[in-house]
Amino acid sequence: MNVIKSRRPAVSPEIDPSTLSNYQNFAVSNTELFLDVLFDEKIVAGTVLYHLEVLNKDVSEVILDTSFLTVESVTVNGSEAEFSLHERVEPLGSRLAISIPPNSQKVQLFISFRTTERCTAIQFLDKEATDGKKAPYLFCQCQAIHARSLFPCFDTPALKSTYKLSAKSPLFTLMSGRPVNQEGDMYYFDQPVPIPSYLISIASGDIVKAKIGPRSDIYSEPVKIKDCQWEFENDMEDFIQIAEKLVFEYEWLRFDSLVLPSSFPYGGMEIPNLCQLTPTLICKDRSQVTVMAHELAHSWSGNLVTNCSWEHFWLNEGWTVYIERRIIEGIATAEAIKAGKKDPFAYGESMRHFSAIIGWNDLENSIKAMGNDAERFSPLVLDLKAGEDPDDSFSTVPYEKGFNLLFLIEQTVGGKKVFDKFIPSYFKKFRYGSLDTYQFVDYLYEFFNDKKVELDSIDWESWLYKPGMPPVMPKFDTTLADECYELADEWFSAIKNNSYLKHDFSSADIKSFEPNQSVVFLDTLISYNKHKDFNWKDHVDALKLMETAYTEYDTSLNAEILFRWYMLQVSGEREEFQHKLGQWLGTVGRMKFVRPGYVLLNEVNRELAIYYFKKFESNYHPICKTMVKKDLGLV
C-alpha cells in the first residue's frame, strides 16, 4: 500500500488531463441537447442548454471542450454573452470560453452550433454504403474525446448530467435515452440517469426493430433484422437476470440495442438504452453474443460507476470483462443443468476460465503489437498528462489486464462467495459518480478490513504501473482448451518431424469444436511463430494442407475465426491470402480486426497494405481511419 500512497495525486479523483474544460468548477443538474441531422450537407446543427450549479464563487467563465465545431451564438441566463474560441491544441481541440456574471450560483448556458466536415464523432454513409441501399445513414461514436466535435461540452468522464434529448431528421432516429415521443420528423428522448458526454449518441437511417426480450428490442436495417433477432433473442433476458443477481437491479429500464453498418469501429459501445453493436457479431451461430453480455455489464461498470479519466480506463473495462465472464459462467451453468451434466457448476466455471484464456492470448498479442509504445500504454494506470490522444492508448490492456487483477483479488480474498459481497457494495458506493484507481483500492481495503495481509500480498506496483504482461498468470482451468492445444501440438510435432503429409488431418479434427475452441486452436497455431527457429513462411505446404483439411474455416461467417484463419495463412506469406485478407478488411470496420490486419499485411507486403487501405479508406469511420494511418506510418 505504501507504493499506492507514494503515487497518490493531491486530489482524488484525479484531475482529467484529456479535457481543456474547467469542469471542476461546476455541477450540471440537467442538459437539453437538440440535434438537427442535415443529410444533404453531411453535418449536424444543434443547440445545447446547460443548467449549471457554480461550485467555485471566484470563477468568471465557463470553459467547454470543442473540436472542429462552429459556434454560432451563446446566451447566459437568456442574455447574449461574450465568448471566445481559442486556438486549437492538438489533439484535444479548442477551448470555448464564455463569461458568466460574478458571484453566480446557478447559470443557464445556451449554445447554438454546427459540426464541420472534420467532425470525428459522426459518420455519414451514402445509401450505397448501407446494407439495404435505400437511404443514407448517420451514426455516432463519442468515446473517448469525440463528443466535443459533436457539441460543446465538458468532455470528461468525470462529470455527469441527466439529459433531455431531441432530434430532427427525415429518417428514423434513435438517441442515448428512453424514447418519449415522435412528432413527424421530431424525436424526443429522456435520460434520467446521469451520464458523461462520451455516452451521448445519435443514429438515423432506414431502421426497424424486433423484440429480443421482455425489456429489450434490437434495431437494424430491415434486411438484417431477422438475423439480428435470431442471434440475440435466446440469451438477452437471461443475461440481464444473471447480472442483476451478481450486482443489483438493472437501473436503465430498457436494454435496447442497435446493429450498425459495417464501418462501426468497435465491437460494441455501451450507449445507455441504445447499445451499439458491430455487424460482425451476426455470425448465425450465437457464438459472439458474449459481446452483448459485455455491453450489458457496462450498465453497472462504466455507465453507473465511471472512470474519472481515461488514465483509469481499466476501472470501466476490467470490471466489465469480469462481470461479462460471470454472465458467461451463469449461462453455461444453466445450460449444463438443463442438459443434465454431472457437475454443472464446474462446467460453468470452466467456461469462464476458457473465456479468460482467450483474453490472455489477446493480451499477449496486443502488447506485442504495441512495439515501442508498450512502455507507455501497457501499464494498467496510464499517464496521459502530456496531452496524448486517449485513442492512441486504446488496446486490450485495460480489459484483460484489468480483468486478471480483479480475478486475482477474487482469489486472494477467498474466492467468489467472499468477493461477491464486495461487488454490489462497490457499485452502490460509487453509483452515479466517477472515481480513480486510488479510491477503488481504498474501498477494497476498507471493505475487506480483515484481509489486509492477504491484499498486501498483491504486487500492486507491478500490476498497476509496470508495462508488459501481468506479474503472475492465474491458474486457469484448461479443460476446454486442452483439446485445442493438443490438436495444435499435433500439427507442430508433425511439421517439426516432417511427417505432416503422412498424418491423417481432416475436418473431423474440429467437428466437435465450439466456435471459441477454433479461436483458441488458431491462436495457438499463430503463436508458434514466437518459437525459436520456427516460422510459418518456411512451412507453406503445411498451411496448404490445413486449408484442404479445414475448408470450413475459409468460409466461416464467424469474424473471430475468419480473421485468425487469414492471419495464420498470411503469417506464412501466402500471396492469395494476403489478397483475401485485404479484401475482407474492406468489408469490416471493427478496429479489433482492421488495425492488426493492416499491421500484418504491412509486415509481409507494405505495397499491398497501402493499396487496400487507400481502396477502402472512405469506408472507415474517422477514428478507425486515423488509427490505421498511424499504424501504417502514413501521418
UniProtKB/Swiss-Prot annotation:
The catalytic site is made up of 295, 399
Q: Which reaction does it catalyse?
A: an epoxide + H2O = an ethanediol
Gene Ontology terms for molecular function: aminopeptidase activity; epoxide hydrolase activity; metallopeptidase activity; zinc ion binding
Coiled-coil region: none
Show the PROSITE patterns listed in the entry: ZINC_PROTEASE
- So where does Zn(2+) get bound? 294, 298, 317
The entry assigns this protein to a family as follows:
Belongs to the peptidase M1 family.
Where does the record place it? Cytoplasm; Nucleus
Q: Which UniProt keywords apply?
A: Cytoplasm, Hydrolase, Metal-binding, Metalloprotease, Nucleus, Protease, Zinc
Offer one Pfam family short name for this entry: Peptidase_M1_N
Cofactor(s), by name: Zn(2+)
Per the record, its GO cellular-component terms are:
cytosol; nucleus
The UniProt entry lists the main location of this chain as cytoplasm
Entry protein name? Leucine aminopeptidase 2-2
In which residues is substrate bound?
Answer: 141-143, 265-270
Q: How is the cofactor bound?
A: Binds 1 zinc ion per subunit.
PANTHER family with a match to the protein in the record: LEUKOTRIENE A-4 HYDROLASE
